[in-house]
């Protein structure tokens, strides 16, 4: 499968000025930008910056960023699922994972996350994929957002809806371990019925084992 990447962008207004939401961004451009010091949800900022550059260099990898001048203040990543997870077991070339989305605290509350997802889906290539994401409450910044689990889940779900992702049932053990955890996905209009059925088998692994 060829992974065509077509650049799109949008501007959003914030209290301190305008932000550029853009992507997919090349590894070279990503490496040349500053990385906001408060983007620490997954790794220390320098390590996460390097990880984004690596993902952008993958054939299927996509990084959409929010940029204030030359500083990255938010991002969303897309790539094939981790080989250790069940979602990679079918070796589906048209199943990609929204692996991480993060916005620096100073830039929250002005639809940066929603716009990152909206710009992501502007590329016609996304209609060839099933885009999935797994949401686990232990990754959520409940303290920083001053929200309980269910309030945060509602915010997260609404943000994902902006990119066309909706809730899907699954028997995956980690997701099933807490009712706030969830699987969300968007099935592109060009995805084959065969791939949809394969995704169903991955979602309900135990049902199809017997």
UniProtKB/Swiss-Prot annotation:
Gene3D superfamilies attached to this UniProt entry: 3.40.630.30
EC number: 2.3.1.-
Biological processes, Gene Ontology terms: acetoin catabolic process; butanediol catabolic process; carbon catabolite repression of transcription by glucose; cellular response to acetate; spore germination; sporulation resulting in formation of a cellular spore
Domain of life according to the entry: Bacteria
Effect in UniProt of substituting residue 43 to H: 25% retention of activity. Two to three-fold reduction in KM for acetyl-CoA. Three-fold slower turnover number. Retains 54% of the activity of the wild-type after heating it to 100 degrees Celsius for 30 minutes
Induction remark: Expression is maximal in stationary phase and is repressed by the addition of glucose to the growth medium. CcpA protein is required for glucose repression. Acetoin does not act as an inducer. Up-regulated during the 80 to 100 minutes of spore germination and into the outgrowth phase.
InterPro entries xrefs: AcuA, Acyl_CoA_acyltransferase, GNAT_dom
Keyword Nucleotide-binding: no
Temperature notes for this entry: Optimum temperature 37 degrees Celsius. Thermostable. Retains 93, 78 and 15 % of its protein acetyltransferase activity after heating to 100 degrees Celsius for 5, 30 and 60 minutes, respectively.
Description of how activity is regulated: Activity is sensitive to salt concentration, a high concentration of KCL (500 mM) is needed for complete inactivation.
Coiled-coil regions listed in the entry: none
SUPFAM superfamilies linked to this entry: Acyl-CoA N-acyltransferases (Nat)
Activity dependence on pH, as recorded: Optimum pH is 7.5.
An annotated Gene Ontology molecular function: acetyl-CoA synthetase acetyltransferase activity
First-tier enzyme category under EC: transferase
Annotated metabolic or biological route of this protein: Ketone degradation; acetoin degradation
Mutagenesis / variant outcome for changing residue 170 to A: 25% retention of activity. Two to three fold reduction in KM for acetyl-CoA. Three-fold slower turnover number. Retains 60% of the activity of the wild-type after heating it to 100 degrees Celsius for 30 minutes
Consequence of gene loss (knockout): Does not impair growth on acetate. Disruption together with other acetoin utilization genes acuB and acuC results in poor growth and sporulation on acetoin or butanediol. Triple deletion of acuA, acuC and srtN improves the growth on acetate but it does not reach that of wild-type under low-acetate conditions.
Family to which this protein belongs: Belongs to the acetyltransferase family.
Assembly notes: Monomer.
Function as written in the Swiss-Prot or TrEMBL entry: Part of the acuABC operon, which is possibly involved in the breakdown of acetoin and butanediol. Acts as an acetyltransferase inactivating acetyl-CoA synthetase AcsA via acetylation at a Lys residue.
Protein name: Acetoin utilization protein AcuA
Species: Bacillus subtilis (strain 168)
């Amino acid at each position: 499968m060829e992974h065509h990447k077509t650049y799109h962008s949008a501007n959003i207004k914030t209290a301190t000025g305008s932000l550029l939401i853009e992507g997919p961004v090349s590894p070279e451009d990503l490496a040349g930008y500053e990385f906001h010091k408060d983007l620490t949800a997954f790794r220390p900022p320098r390590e996460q910056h390097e990880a984004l550059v690596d993902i952008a260099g993958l054939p299927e990898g996509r990084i959409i960023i929010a940029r204030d001048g030359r500083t990255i203040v938010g991002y969303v990543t897309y790539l094939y699922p981790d080989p250790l997870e069940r979602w990679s077991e079918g070796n589906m070339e048209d199943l990609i994972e929204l692996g991480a989305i993060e916005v620096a605290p100073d830039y929250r509350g002005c639809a940066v996350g929603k716009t990152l997802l909206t710009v992501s889906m502007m590329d016609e290539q996304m209609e060839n994929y099933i885009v999935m994401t797994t949401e686990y409450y232990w990754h959520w910044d409940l303290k920083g957002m001053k929200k309980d689990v269910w309030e945060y889940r509602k915010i997260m779900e609404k943000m994902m809806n902006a990119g066309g992702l909706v809730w899907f049932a699954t028997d995956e053990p980690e997701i099933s371990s807490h009712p706030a955890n969830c699987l969300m996905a968007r099935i592109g209009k060009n995805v084959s019925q065969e791939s949809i059925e394969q995704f169903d088998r991955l979602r309900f692994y135990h049902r199809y084992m017997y």
